Amino acid sequence: MMAEQNMQEFIEVLSSKAAVPGGGGACAYVAAAGMALGAMVANLTTGKKKYAQYQEEIEELLSKAEQLSKELMTYMDKDAESFEPLSKAYGLPKDTKEQQEYKEEVMEKALKEASLTPVALMEKILDALKILERLSVVGSRLAIS
């Protein structure tokens, strides 16, 4: 599982000739890190008198940020898994008309399936941005940089 690799291992594989991880896995990793930074802002704000009026909301945002960061990490593997059939489809023979038709059919299905994960990831990132936007308003000014 990619999410269990250390950062150096992930970066090394990302920079290699390997088909995965690719842009989707890297995007998921960066989004999870961004959401973790949002959780850090919430943690640094929790319990501060200056932000007492937002305490309940900050705790809720913290919970959402921590959960979403974990969910985003799962997309590192989901992206690789959804790309695998497409990668295999690229390698199908196309010497005969039947092979070409079969490859075209498989490619169409694989492309559609492979696109679902990045779209779902983008939706999760939009959720993350909403949390970060709110934290920029109610979070500690010292933690937001």
Regions found by a protein language model. Give the residues of each.
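Transmembrane signal-anchor/signal-peptide helices with a preference for the extracytoplasmic
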Residues: 40-52
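A structural-propensity feature for long, helix-poor, extended segments
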Residues: 50-88
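Conserved phosphate/anionic-ligand binding catalytic regions in large, soluble enzymes, centered on
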Residues: 16-37, 142-145
